[in-house]
């Protein structure tokens, strides 16, 4: 189905098709590879955690396309850094630098996301975004990974990023929304 959908998107003139997460399974790797071979106009994109192994899988699956994007990410919220990654701020910053720089070896089109962005300390988020852009990310994605934010807060976060990240004008800013109804915060 992914391949059929990507062909329709390609014919429609969709700019970017985020085709999958190649390292996640052999099926996803094959689907991303097939999409990268079949699209003629759209730019296929693969998702990768901030590791060389993930980025290598993205590159291997996307290399058939004339142009492609690697979308790398790492968790930046305190709860994810502590319990999911077992990393501190400096380690996360190092991982951002290494992963974006490494992805740039394969393509000029790198997207970076601060996973669980809406629960990330804003001052730390500004640092991560500025660093990712300085390392070559052309698109910055702010995801509401767990559906935490309400629309007004999310809008304030985006405005705050625009006002506090000095090099934000050098990147495209995007958002990934996961709004639940009702908000998880409604339950305390």
Please provide the spans of the model-predicted regions.
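Alpha/beta enzyme core
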Residues: 2-12, 56-82, 89-110, 117-168
């Amino acid at each position: 189905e992914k391949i059929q959908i990507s062909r329709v998107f390609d014919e429609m003139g969709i700019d970017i098709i985020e085709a999958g997460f190649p390292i996640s399974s052999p099926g996803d790797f094959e689907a991303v590879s097939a999409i990268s071979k079949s699209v003629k106009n759209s730019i296929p994109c693969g998702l990768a955690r901030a590791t060389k192994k993930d980025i290598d899988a993205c590159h291997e699956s996307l290399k058939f396309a004339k142009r492609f994007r690697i979308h790398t990410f790492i968790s930046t919220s305190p709860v994810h850094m502590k319990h999911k990654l077992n990393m501190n701020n400096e380690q996360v910053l190092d991982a951002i630098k290494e992963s974006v720089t490494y992805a740039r070896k394969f393509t000029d089109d790198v997207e970076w996301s601060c996973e669980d962005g809406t629960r990330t300390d804003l001052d730390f988020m500004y640092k991560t975004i500025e660093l990712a852009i300085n390392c070559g990310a052309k698109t910055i994605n702010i995801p509401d990974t767990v559906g935490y934010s309400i629309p007004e807060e999310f809008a304030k976060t985006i405005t705050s990023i625009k006002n506090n990240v000095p090099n934000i004008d050098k990147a495209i800013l995007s958002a990934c929304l996961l709004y639940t109804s009702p908000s998880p915060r409604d339950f305390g």
